[in-house]
UniProtKB/Swiss-Prot annotation:
Protein name as it appears in the record: Lymphocyte cytosolic protein 2
GO annotations of cellular component type: cell-cell junction; cytosol; plasma membrane raft; TCR signalosome
Comp. bias intervals (Polar residues): 151-172, 340-354
Organism annotation: Mus musculus
Localisation per UniProt entry: Cytoplasm
């Protein structure tokens, strides 16, 4: 649609829903007319159509209506250049625009509105001409009368009177006061022309009044700045000696405001550093105690602390394997000595170990050295608890292990007691997995030496479950001389020996956690031993 046939944006903004409906009736958009009346869409709303508003019109008309709305907005933009300038003399338009010739300029109005006369409905033409005669005539005349306002400068001077205050300055600078004040301070004005120019747009009426005060104050400020610069080096010189920390407390008093924060901050840093080593030092003494313990235990055994713990055990275990029922004497003494920690872990040993404690309280002193006697547990179960107090009280076999093997071959110590169907001493992880997969049943397990082979991580328990091999560390705690299974984060179950761990989880399910998938939780008992394969 040509812009000549499109009404101006200013007109459409003033339309109500009835005027917009009449316009659509004029364009033969009966369906749009109904939508406008139904939803009460006025001209301003039509020019700023939203997605919700345009959906209210028929779908076939939506492209045409959006194009029409754009054309109306563009039609006003072309005339906006002329309408901006006459906004100031609008007060004069009411008095002068009607006095000017309407004959020549009415032809321009006809030129702009003649396309509207071509519309089929004559009634609508009257509707469009009536606002043009009253409102649009003023805008068009003002737009086209740009030369006449230049001729009517005498009439417009009343509205431009505020800028006449510039003549009072009698100088090229707008912000300058009378010449008398300027002459008093000739050197200062050239220094301050740039900062004085910005206040001009804020208010020209007050421009001659506001600058004189800063002009009088500026020299005083500049003088103050010069005087302030003189003590400034004295302050810097005074701050130089306090940089020495030895003189800092003496210099703090004259410079309380500016100097206390830096000195107060600096000592705070070393104080924090002094506290840091204090926090780190406490763990060091226990480490020294550990070395002292190792040195004290050195003459007894040359290996790590878990090994001397087995120093007495291997003798008894070898004897137990040869003749379990013939040597019951050393067996009851060991569980009875370590019963302080054992009852909290397993049910069977705890029920039988609690009895000797009441009868033999003094046996705990020897239990700290050797208490990992897993192979001796089956004979305990075969024997009654009543046999233990007399056997322990006799104490015949207690000194035997110490003189016979005070320092036996340490590797053989742990191999012989653990050399059962589920223990393999030196084997790699792939070989151990192959041994487990030979049986290939859930609950297949074995115990092998850890690749680290340290005092804290001596063994590894490998379990096959659902075609996946789980490696669980068997840790040794030197302080309490007990074995722990896993990381100990999920719970703390300590055992006197590795055999106790195997015996316990043969009856109780073992929690298996996948390192890659922490959400998986499986439980199984140790059923099939793969150590002899």
């Amino acid at each position: 649609m040509a812009l000549k046939n499109v009404p101006f944006r200013s007109e459409v903004l003033a339309w109500n829903s009835d005027n917009l409906a009449d316009y659509f009736r004029k364009l033969n958009y009966r369906d749009c007319e109904k939508a406008v009346k139904k939803y009460h869409i006025d001209g301003a709303r039509f020019l700023n159509l939203t997605e919700n508003d345009i959906q209210k019109f028929p779908k076939l008309r939506m492209p045409l209506l959006s194009k029409l709305s754009q054309d109306i907005n563009k039609n006003e933009e072309r005339r906006s250049i002329f309408t901006r300038k006459p906004q100031i003399p609008r007060f004069l338009e009411e008095t002068e625009s009607h006095e000017e010739d309407d004959g020549g300029w009415s032809s321009f109005e006809d030129d702009y509105e003649s396309p509207n006369d071509d519309d089929p409905d004559g009634e609508d033409d009257g509707d469009y001409e009536s606002p043009n005669e009253e409102e649009q005539a003023l805008v068009d005349d003002a737009a086209d009368y740009e030369p006449p306002p230049s001729n009517n400068e005498e009439a417009l001077q009343s509205s431009i009177l505020p800028p006449n205050s510039f003549h009072n300055t009698n100088s090229m600078y707008i912000d300058r006061p009378p010449t008398g004040k300027v002459s008093q301070q000739p050197p200062v004005p050239p220094l301050r022309p740039k900062p004085a120019l910005p206040p001009l747009p804020t208010g020209r009426n007050h421009s001659p009044l506001s600058p004189p005060h800063p002009n009088h104050e500026e020299p005083s400020r500049s003088g103050n700045n010069k005087t302030a610069k003189l003590p400034a080096p004295s302050i810097d010189r005074s701050t130089k000696p306090p940089l020495d920390r030895s003189l800092a407390p003496l210099d703090r008093e004259p410079f309380i405001l500016g100097k206390k924060p830096p000195f107060s901050d600096k000592p705070s840093a070393p104080l924090g550093r002094e506290h840091l080593p204090k926090i780190q030092k406490p763990p060091l003494p226990p480490a020294m105690d550990r070395h002292e313990r190792n040195e004290r235990l050195g003459p007894v055994t040359t290996r790590k602390p878990p090994v001397p713990r087995h120093g007495r055990g291997p003798d008894r275990r070898e004897n137990d394997e040869d003749d379990v029922h013939q040597r019951p004497l050393p067996q009851p003494s060991l569980p009875s000595m370590s019963s302080n920690t054992f009852p909290s872990r397993s049910v069977q040993p705890s029920s039988k170990n609690t009895f000797p404690l009441a009868h033999m309280p003094g046996a705990f002193s020897e239990s700290n050295i050797g208490f990992q006697q897993s192979a001796s547990l089956p004979p305990y179960f075969s024997q009654g608890p009543g046999n233990r107090p007399p056997l322990r009280s006799e104490g015949r076999n207690l000194p035997l292990p110490v003189p016979n093997r005070p320092q036996p071959p340490s590797p053989g110590e742990e191999e012989t007691p653990l050399d059962e169907e589920w223990y393999v001493s030196y084997i790699t992880r792939p070989e151990a997995e192959a041994a487990l997969r030979k049986i290939n049943q859930d609950g297949t397990f074995l115990v092998r030496d850890s690749s680290k082979k340290t005092a804290n991580n001596p063994y590894v328990l490998m379990v096959l479950y659902k075609d996946k091999v789980y490696n669980i560390q068997i840790r040794y705690q030197e302080e309490s001389q007990v074995y722990l299974l896993g990381t100990g984060l999920r719970g703390k179950e300590d055992f006197l020996s590795v055999s106790d761990i195997i015996d316990y989880f043969r009856k109780m399910p073992l929690l298996l956690i996948d390192g890659k998938n922490r959400g998986s939780r499986y439980q199984c008992t140790l059923t099939h031993a793969a150590g002899c394969l």
